[in-house]
């Protein structure tokens, strides 16, 4: 998560939460891009800790690099544009912020294995190193809702674990049978927003399975070549709203699990093959995750 730290926190009476936050930044879990003056304040704060015999070599090394990076940014003719919004840390909320920032960010999904595996494979394929690293380090966790029925309530409940920096997002299927039909899950999205869930993405197409590349289905259903061929033959607007479970195994059949097989390396081209807008939408999902990481 990108932080906006008020340097007044360095003058407070309780240094513990400040040290905790700076340590998280030094380890690369969160980001802070201070101005040159703010970086110097941070470096002075870390120097005082060192003088007080508090051994924190990682912080000392980070503070020096942060000052150098701030100087480089100030001399740049082109300021950075875009990126995630910053989270404000002040002397008034630093303790609560430290607690929130030390917890894993939460993505509420219908199925932890299926949807979670898809998000992981998607992040690798689209070269989102931040999300991949966060998943590897368990800085981002999946919360399993077991379907859409209680998803909003569960996401709202997850938000209660945070005090000032709510790091929760929700990823939900639209369950739409076609592009013209409103999603039956719109009410769940509205309920989640009213309950304080800050980040929600509803898939444009029917469900997560509709975003799974052809290569995955070819591996799962080697004995159903005609079914896979039919899938490839549909235009994106047809394929995106088909119920793929019914297509491959029938209403009462069982889909492969895990959805995204381990060991299969996918690329951006595999997702782009599904339709011209697919990669852009998946990058929106990743951008949402950056907001809570």
List the model feature ranges, each with a label:
Residues 1-86:
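N-terminal extension/subdomain marker
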Residues 183-261:
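Activity-critical C-terminal alpha-helical subdomain
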Residues 122-126, 215-216, 220, 289:
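Generic structural signal for hydrophobic core residues of well-folded globular domains
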Residues 63-176:
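RecA-like P-loop NTPase motor core
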Residues 178-181:
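Extracytoplasmic/secreted cell-surface and envelope-processing proteins
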Residues 17-20, 58, 207, 230, ...:
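Exposed alpha-helical structural elements
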Residues 240-293:
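Terminal low-complexity/disordered tails
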């Amino acid at each position: 998560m990108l932080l906006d730290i008020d340097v007044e926190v360095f003058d407070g009476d309780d240094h513990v939460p400040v040290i905790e936050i700076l340590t998280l930044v030094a380890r690369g879990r969160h980001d802070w891009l201070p101005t040159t003056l703010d970086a110097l304040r941070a470096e002075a704060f870390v120097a005082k800790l060192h003088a007080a015999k508090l051994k924190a070599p990682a912080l000392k090394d980070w503070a020096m690099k942060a000052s150098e990076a701030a100087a480089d940014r100030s001399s740049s003719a082109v300021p950075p544009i875009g990126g995630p919004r910053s989270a404000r840390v002040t002397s008034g909320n630093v303790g609560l912020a430290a607690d929130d920032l030390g917890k894993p960010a939460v993505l509420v999904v219908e199925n932890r294995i299926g949807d979670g595996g898809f998000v992981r494979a998607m992040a690798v394929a689209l070269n989102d190193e931040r999300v991949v690293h966060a998943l590897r380090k368990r800085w981002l966790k999946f919360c399993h809702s077991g379907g859409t029925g209680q998803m909003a309530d569960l996401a709202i409940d997850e938000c209660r674990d945070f005090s000032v920096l709510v790091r929760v997002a929700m990823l939900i299927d639209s369950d739409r049978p076609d592009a013209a039909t409103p999603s039956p899950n719109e009410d769940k999205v509205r309920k989640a927003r009213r309950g304080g869930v800050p980040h929600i993405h509803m898939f444009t197409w029917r469900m997560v399975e509709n975003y799974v590349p052809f290569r995955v289905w070819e591996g799962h259903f080697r004995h159903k070549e005609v079914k896979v061929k039919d899938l490839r033959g549909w235009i994106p607007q047809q394929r995106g709203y088909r119920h793929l479970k019914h297509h491959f195994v029938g209403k009462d059949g069982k889909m492969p699990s895990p959805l995204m097989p381990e060991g299969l390396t996918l690329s951006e081209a595999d997702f782009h093959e599904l339709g011209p807008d697919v990669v852009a939408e998946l990058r929106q999902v990743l951008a949402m995750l950056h907001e809570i990481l």
